[in-house]
Each structure stands twice: as C-alpha cells, then as structure tokens.
C-alpha cells in the first residue's frame, strides 16, 4: 500500500500506532478477565506473548531487517496466526493445555501461510523490483505453486487427523465444505500465467480459511 502510493508513510505510521495501542488495551482487559489476580504468572506470560505478536506484526515490514522481505514471513505467519492464536486462545478460555490442539492449529497456520503465499505470488514482479526477497521471489513461480498446494493439502491432513482422533459423529467433518473453494483455488493457481489474475483468488482463500475455522468449531461442538 505504501510502496504503491495508496497511503503515505505518515498515515501508515499513525494507523500502526493506533492499532497497537488499541490491541494492547483489549489484550490487557481480556487477560485480566481470563486470569484475574489469582494467576498472575499466566497473565504476565500472555501479556508478553501479546507484545511479541505486536512486535512481530510491526517487524514484518518495518525497518531494514524486516523479516517479511527476507523469506521468513511464512514462518512467522504460521506461528502467530496458527499455533499461538489457536492454542493460546484455548488456554486463555479453558486454563488447560491439550497437545492435540496443535493439529487444528497447524491447519489454521498453513492456510494463513497460503493466504500470504498467494499475496506474494500476485506481487512477485513488484517485490523483485523493490528488492523484497519474499519466499516466492526466492522459490520462483513454479516452486511457489507447489508450495501452495502443500500448504492447503497439509491443512486438510492435519484437520482430518484431529477429527479421527476425536471421532464421534459425521458432522465433525463439516469443515470439508471449506476445502471445496480451496481445491478450486489450487486449480486456478496451477493454470495461472498472469500474476495479477490471482488478486480475486486472495479473497477466496482468506474467506475459505475463515469458513474452515467456523465450520471446524461447529463440527466439534455439535
């Protein structure tokens, strides 16, 4: 957005400051409601994780050593949007740790990385021109496509594994509906030649990831 001139660096800075302060205020309130004063250690730990998340979000594109432009963006998206958000939320609300939750957390992380990968595939020409060494730029178009397939298929496999380990009813596989547009996306990516045409696919994968999270949760609750 900044590099294309849609918004100015000052506007971006103001938006980041506002979002950071607002997010931290909400995080502190949520942590206090969840743990109170009785579990001060947990409160401190989650507050530090919140700070780490904010720092990771800022460091993604800000500064000369921004990790988003050194091929590490996918790893951080997987960790913070997948493992930390899913497992962390579960601990926050239940005060328990379930190792098997790392399976659906991995699914969310992989799909989040797929969104980023698709975004970077769309922008790879511009990123090359601005010396932004994303993973797609490093891999090249064909390998980036294969990587995209692996992310989506990996998300499916880990979700199915979790359900198989907790299987009670067919409705637990409700989340498979979300993979219909995701598999259609794989077909589009495989046939893609003009990177700009991937722009419309970005929204589809993002919404499919959201749909997966909703349907997966409903399937496990019911």
Model-derived regions: residue spans:
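Multi-pass membrane catalytic core of lipid/isoprenoid biosynthesis enzymes
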Residues: 1-35, 132-167, 207, 212
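Cytosolic, membrane-interface loops and tails of multi-pass inner-membrane proteins
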Residues: 1-7, 116-141, 186-196
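Intramembrane alpha-helical segments
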Residues: 4-96
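Structural signature of hydrophobic alpha-helical transmembrane segments
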Residues: 40-51, 105-107, 171-177
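Transmembrane alpha-helical segments that form the membrane-embedded catalytic/substrate-channel core
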Residues: 51-63, 83, 87-88, 106-121, ...
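Small-residue-rich segments of transmembrane alpha-helices in multi-pass membrane proteins
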Residues: 75-89, 136-141, 202-216
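Functional transmembrane core segments of multi-pass inner-membrane proteins
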Residues: 76-124, 142-145
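Extended hydrophobic alpha-helices typical of membrane-associated regions
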Residues: 164-222
């Amino acid at each position: 957005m900044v590099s294309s001139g849609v918004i100015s660096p000052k506007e971006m800075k103001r938006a980041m400051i506002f979002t950071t302060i607002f997010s931290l205020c909400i995080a502190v309130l949520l942590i206090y409601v969840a743990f109170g004063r009785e579990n001060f250690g947990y409160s401190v730990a989650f507050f530090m994780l919140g700070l780490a998340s904010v720092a990771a979000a800022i460091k993604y594109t800000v500064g000369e050593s921004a990790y988003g432009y050194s091929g590490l963006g996918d790893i951080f998206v997987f960790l913070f949007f997948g493992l930390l958000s899913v497992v962390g939320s579960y601990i926050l609300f239940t005060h328990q740790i379930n190792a098997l939750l790392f399976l659906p957390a991995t699914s969310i992380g992989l799909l989040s990385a797929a969104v980023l990968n698709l975004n970077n595939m769309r922008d790879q020409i511009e990123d090359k021109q601005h010396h932004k060494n994303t993973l797609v730029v490093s891999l090249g178009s064909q390998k980036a496509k294969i990587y995209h397939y692996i992310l989506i298929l990996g998300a499916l496999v880990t979700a199915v594994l979790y359900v198989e380990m907790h299987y009670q009813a067919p409705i637990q596989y409700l989340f498979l509906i979300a993979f219909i547009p995701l598999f259609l996306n794989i077909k589009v990516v495989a046939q893609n030649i003009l990177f700009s045409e991937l722009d419309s696919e970005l929204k589809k994968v993002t919404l499919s990831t959201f749909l997966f999270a909703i349907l997966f949760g409903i399937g496990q609750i019911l």
